[in-house]
Amino acid sequence: MQLKALEVREITDYIKKMMDNDIILRNVRVKGEISNLKYHSTGIYFTLKDEIASLKCVMFNEYGKLLNFTLQDGMSVIVTGRISVYERNGTYQLYAQSIQSDGIGALYFAFNKLKEKLQKEGLFDSDKKKPIPKHPKKIAVVTSPTGAVIRDIITISRRRNPTVDILVVPVLVQGSSAADEICNALRILNKREDIDVIILARGGGSLEEIWPFNEEKVARCIYASRIPVVSAVGHETDFTISDFVADLRAPTPSAAAEIVVPDIKVYQRELFLLKTKLLTLMTAELNRKKKEFEGLKRALYLNSPTKKSEILRHKVENLTASLYNEMLSIYQHKRNDFLILAEKLNSLSPLKVLTRGYTIVLDKQEKVISSVKDIKPYDEIKILFKDGKAKAIVQEVKENE
């Protein structure tokens, strides 16, 4: 009896059903090395191989978006999914639902491979690093909007210099979408003209968790930024590709705030030193001119003949006029400098906050009260406003929980 001839689609459909109904093939974990990696609009296509065999794989976007690291050729991974037949060309392949690195070594391999590539391209060269401004007016912080990182940065910034504006740009800092959000934030900030420096920050974590900061797209966005970027990712011992590309690496997010935000007390000391130096220079210049003038008067007295006396008299008159004009010019110039410095110093005065609607609370000894621990019920206090002052009695003291 002659066997019935089956059409190609029939035998292919039969094989597909056998595989789809196989209890083992419906849920398998396969270990191997990635090769022929291709990213497509529909998903990720690659081949999984070992020393003897190879297996075609596909991970569609619904699962690919859950990856928390970037796949690369040569990376050792473990793929979980199902084996089935792709009917169009009659080949079987692994439909991946999740991919994990085969140990931390795979991620280190990808890290070192990208590091070597970018280093050869010159992205780490020190002569291409942009200087961090010493007196920034506005700082952008690209990080998660919740957690200790942004709280620490804001607290330290306000303590060091409350006049510096902090712009928080919220992004994901781990997961498959984090790299794209970070790049988008950097592009948006580079379209603004009011940002002086960018802090890119997140707290510590495993290599997988901080992996977005090791992705090539993030590295290239940092390198392309016209605004200086400070990388502050993880703990002091953590290093990422972002650290190498950034214009400056801070060991922690808190350290980044200490580095970038100038201390207002340093401003005040600088202004005081400039004022002292200005007064010293003015005094020295006036004394020098006075000595020169006294010397000419003495020469006139010692050379008494009429002609010499007349010549010296004219010389003294000219010098006197010149001295007066020069002293007047110096005085006006130094006075203008002093007024500018005084205005800067006044702008930094703690009393300046009164003009912005804040108040200052003093005790009986005229000392500033900065904590509820400094007062108790029925204490007499004084409240300073921008346009006057008031006395009050404390009714109740309650500390924050």
UniProtKB/Swiss-Prot annotation:
Signal peptide: none annotated. It comes from the Bacteria. It is found in: Cytoplasm. SUPFAM superfamilies: Nucleic acid-binding proteins. It catalyses: Exonucleolytic cleavage in either 5'- to 3'- or 3'- to 5'-direction to yield nucleoside 5'-phosphates. GO terms for cellular component: cytoplasm; exodeoxyribonuclease VII complex. InterPro entries: Exonuc_VII_L, Exonuc_VII_lsu_C, NA-bd_OB-fold, OB-fold_nuc-bd_dom. It is an enzyme of class 3 (hydrolase). GO terms for biological process: DNA catabolic process. Its EC number is 3.1.11.6. One of its GO terms (molecular function) is nucleic acid binding. Pfam families: Exonuc_VII_L, tRNA_anti_2. The keyword Flavoprotein does not apply. Keywords: Cytoplasm, Exonuclease, Hydrolase, Nuclease. The keyword Manganese does not apply. Belongs to the XseA family. Bidirectionally degrades single-stranded DNA into large acid-insoluble oligonucleotides, which are then degraded further into small acid-soluble oligonucleotides. Heterooligomer composed of large and small subunits. This is Exodeoxyribonuclease 7 large subunit. It comes from Thermoanaerobacter pseudethanolicus (strain ATCC 33223 / 39E). The lineage of its organism: Bacteria, Bacillati, Bacillota, Clostridia, Thermoanaerobacterales. The gene is xseA.
